Amino acid sequence: MKLNCKGFMMAEVVVVSVIICTVLVTLYTALARINNAYDTRNRYYDIDTLYFTEEVNDMLIYMGYINEYISTNDSKEVNLNNVFSNDSNFYSAYNIDTASGGSIKMYFALYDANSVGSLAGMNSNTTFKDYISYLKEHFDYNEKYEYMLITEICKTGDDCYYYGLRVR
């Protein structure tokens, strides 16, 4: 006499399917978190933006503009036209499509949370405001830095990269 095992097989299939679905959902959520962290790191610590910021910092020091920025004690936008008065092609050097809304903006702030936080009101871009809140949360403002230069390079209107250079 044969036993009818169809009910047991059906229960086994359901249990195994639930286990497999649970594992796949867990993997998906973990990979989504990793992808978000990578995207944040990629946008907030962009290499091109780093080199541009360091180049402008060196030029501000060389031209003596940095002393003016420090003495005013205000957070403000850096006038890049003064820095690059002899070279108007710095947009093309960084693949900036100005026709599609691309731009380069740089901001100066003393190295404290309030000065950095005040920069959020100077730019209407939502991702810039997110970056400023990221800076306020992730930096230790008790360190002995003097000022920050924060750069926003937007290749197009909605493809923006950032870097915050802390200077002693």
Predicted features, each with a name:
Residues 56-63, 104-110, 147-151:
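Extended low-polarity, hydrophobic cluster-rich segments
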Residues 3-53:
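Aliphatic-rich helix starts adjacent to a transmembrane/signal segment
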Residues 53-77:
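Alpha-helix exit/C-cap motif
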Residues 119-168:
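Low-complexity, S/T/G/P-rich flexible repeat/linker segments used as non-globular hinges
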Residues 14, 76, 94, 130, ...:
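Residue-level marker of intrinsically disordered, low-complexity segments enriched
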Residues 70-123, 135:
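Low-complexity, serine/threonine/proline-enriched polar segments
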